[in-house]
Amino acid sequence: HTWLRRQRQMCIRDRLKGSCAKGLLIFVCAMKGDDENVVNALTQKISKLRIFESSEGKMDLTLHYIGGEALVISQFTLAADIKKGNRPGFSSAANPQDANYFYELFIANLKRIKIPTQQGVFGASMKVELLNNGPATFWLDSNS
């Protein structure tokens, strides 16, 4: 599962760890049942999404076209199940070893297709700042 936002900066222990001037903040959450095919498909989908505004004000440009970059953050809380009770459950999240593998694979895939990419630290507590244009936020998963 991947959640896209447009402005991005991330700090760990009050030190700037990553930022990007133009592009996407991508929150990544691996779910049970995800595999390399899901990671590869999401990488390709993100590279082809026409979500940046053209001169006509329409979402028509890709991340590559605008010369954008990605800041990728692991975010297992996207797997939260809040259907019952008031405390979220995370039983649908992939185990940490698989999640870290898929997170690193996703980042490697972005770099392989020439998207400049910075990343957070898997499992770390981070302060993430964003300024969201639009606002425009997109949810992508294996069904996208």
Q: Which sequence ranges carry the predicted segments?
A:
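Residue-level signal for inorganic ion chemistry
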Residues: 42, 73, 136
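Compact, glycine-rich, soluble single-domain proteins
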Residues: 19-67, 77-92, 96-108
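Short, conserved loop-to-beta-strand elements that form functional interface hotspots
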Residues: 100-129
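Single conserved hydrophobic/aromatic residue that forms the stacking wall/gate
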Residues: 1-12
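C-terminal edge-of-domain segments
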Residues: 127-141
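Glycine/charge-rich, flexible interdomain linkers and switch-proximal surface loops
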Residues: 55-70, 118-130
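Compositionally biased, non-globular sequence tracts
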Residues: 19, 139, 143-144
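Short beta-strand/turn micro-motifs at beta-sheet edges
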Residues: 13-17
